Curated annotation (Swiss-Prot):
Database matches in PROSITE patterns: CHAPERONINS_CPN60
The protein's name in its UniProt record: Chaperonin GroEL
One Gene Ontology molecular-function label: ATP-dependent protein folding chaperone
Ranges where the record places region Disordered: 525-547
Broad class of the protein's primary localization: cytoplasm
Length: 547
């Protein structure tokens, strides 16, 4: 086991604070509408330019192990806030730095760290209650656009795109962000259910220009296993031909003789047909087939339930108004499913979302809800260069997360004002002893840090701005850093999601409390450098006489 280096007391805390400051100072320059960019070197390709706090934090690794521990703890604040709220990472970092700085000063002055922590926790819970109480619901897409604009560092176009996407697919719909190959940023909405499986043979194509298979008023056969032979299906196929309607087969696979027979039938014009593989794998495939069955009013033909292909009748098939299939995707529009059954299925999946602990599973379940309930919108981010596209995509991701948070828990005054207004809930609050009171005072001071930093990044004196805002009795009075004027922040359209502000404060206070109560730090001792190799041995002289 490697030897350890142990630091105690003031020495440990000073080293840790240096690390905290290095990371926080790099992150906080991005805060606010006039926040600056950070350029990050990459081991390959062009450097990355970003204004996203968590992206900056993730890149920082310090050579001094003790300083690095402090930096990693604050990185944890940014990561947790990003995971919970999807935005507000820079605010959380600024708050954490402010609480840690003031807290360590108090510890150095001889106060009890545990009482300071209790005071900080007490004050934080009071302010969080005040933020929740001040939140009001998002009323229209104009407010959604404003939240998106603020989170995208003041780019109104990004806010508008997100509002448009949310309007089209609803609050439950899935909105994904992709890089566009062109210069323009655009929103594309996929109505109905889309899954990532294309046609099994290009011979199924009906529109040769677009290379798509388009089927109208179509029957859908959902089969859980592979189809190798069509012999058991002959009665069903004859019934479909009689109905003169097209048929889509969705199965684990359609192979060999079965696929060849379908293609020959299609080419001869006897049967309008197409076949695609079922989406997903394993249990997820079964669940998605069941989703499609409920959406189209059909049944999944499953051997687990004792169903055989030869016994399938035409009324066991699903129906849809239109199906469009290209080489990569299948889209089912206007399925024939019963609305009550679809709603029940959505409620069932939502319960699974509540219960799951896996982020990946949660994301996949949310996609399934969206496909059943709303639809899917894709925001394609364009730009002149790859670096610009990546930087804008970061901001669109942030803005999208912020608007989702706003829809969930409502909005509060933006620009750091909500924290200062929340701080007024601490007036008259006292702890059980003077050290706890000091903890409450630390939080009260720290709440001004984001507003001060926003003003500072805009080239204005942060102390003056914070003083003016603090003295005002109007709850929505603040400083608009974009236009450098004071007034009603709601009228300026400077608003933040309550969830983002609340999460930033909770996570910052939680990690800061841990750092303040640290008394010892342990890290691996640096390996001693091995001595450089000695000079090469000379030739062995003086042995001429030896034969």
């Amino acid at each position: 086991m490697a030897a350890k280096d142990v630091k105690f007391d003031t020495d440990a805390r000073d080293r840790m604070l240096r690390g905290v400051n290095i990371l926080a100072d790099a992150v906080k320059v991005t805060l606010g509408p006039k926040g600056r960019n950070v350029v990050i070197d990459k081991s390959f390709g062009a450097p990355r330019i970003t204004k996203d706090g968590v992206s900056v934090a993730k890149e920082i690794e310090l050579s001094d192990k003790f300083e690095n521990m402090g930096a990693q703890m604050v990185k944890e604040v940014a990561s947790r806030t990003n995971d919970e709220a999807g935005d507000g990472t820079t605010t959380a970092t600024v708050l954490a730095q402010a609480i840690i700085k003031e807290g360590l000063k108090a510890v150095a002055a001889g106060m009890n760290p545990m009482d300071l922590k209790r005071g900080i926790d007490l004050a934080t819970s009071k302010v969080v209650e005040a933020i929740k109480a001040a939140a009001r619901p998002v009323n229209d897409s104009h407010e959604v656009a404003q939240v998106g604009t603020i989170s995208a560092n003041g780019e109104a176009q990004i806010g508008r795109f997100i509002a448009e996407a949310m309007q089209k697919v609803g609050n439950e719909g899935v909105i994904t962000v992709e890089e566009n190959k062109g210069l323009e940023t655009e929103v594309e909405v996929v109505e109905g259910m889309q899954f990532d499986r294309g046609y099994l043979s290009p011979y199924f194509v009906t529109n040769a220009d677009k290379m798509t298979a388009e089927l109208d008023d179509v029957y859908i056969l959902l089969h859980e296993k592979k189809l190798s032979s069509l012999q058991p299906m002959v009665p069903l196929l004859e019934a479909v031909i009689q109905s003169q309607k097209p048929l889509l087969i969705i199965a684990e696979d359609v192979e060999g003789e079965a696929l060849a027979t379908l293609v020959v039938n299609k080419l001869r014009g006897g049967l309008k047909i197409a076949a695609v593989k079922a989406p997903g794998f394993g249990d997820r495939r079964k669940a998605m087939l069941q989703d499609i069955a409920i959406l189209t009013g059909g049944q999944v033909i499953s051997e687990d339930l004792g169903m055989k292909l030869e016994n399938v009748t035409i009324d066991m098939l699903g129906r849809a108004k239109k199906i469009s299939i290209n080489k990569d995707n299948t889209t089912i529009v206007d399925g024939n499913g019963d609305k009550a059954e679809i709603d029940a299925r959505v409620a069932q999946i939502r319960n699974q979302i509540e219960e799951t602990s896996s982020d990946y599973d949660r994301e996949k379940l949310q996609e399934r809800v969206a496909k059943l309930a709303g639809g899917v919108a894709v925001i394609r981010v364009g730009g002149m260069t790859e670096v610009e596209v990546k930087e804008r995509k970061d901001r669109v991701d942030d803005a999208l997360n912020a608007t989702r948070a706003a829809v969930q828990e409502g909005i509060v005054v933006g620009g750091g004002v909500a924290l200062i207004q929340g701080g007024k809930a601490l007036d008259g609050l006292t702890g059980e002893n003077p050290d706890q009171n000091a903890g409450i005072t630390i939080v009260r001071r720290a709440l001004e840090a984001p507003l001060r930093q926003i003003a500072q990044n805009a080239g204005v004196d942060g102390s003056v701005v914070a003083g003016k805002v603090r003295e005002s009795n109007e709850k929505s009075f603040g400083f608009n850093a974009q236009t450098e004027e004071y007034g009603d922040m709601f009228k300026f359209g400077v608003i933040d999601p309550a969830k983002v502000v609340r999460t930033a404060l909770e996570d910052a206070a939680s990690v800061a409390s841990l750092l303040i109560t640290t008394e010892a730090m342990i890290a691996d001792k640096p390996e001693p450098k091995s001595p450089a190799g000695g000079p090469g041995m000379g030739g062995m002289g003086g042995m001429d006489g030896m034969m």
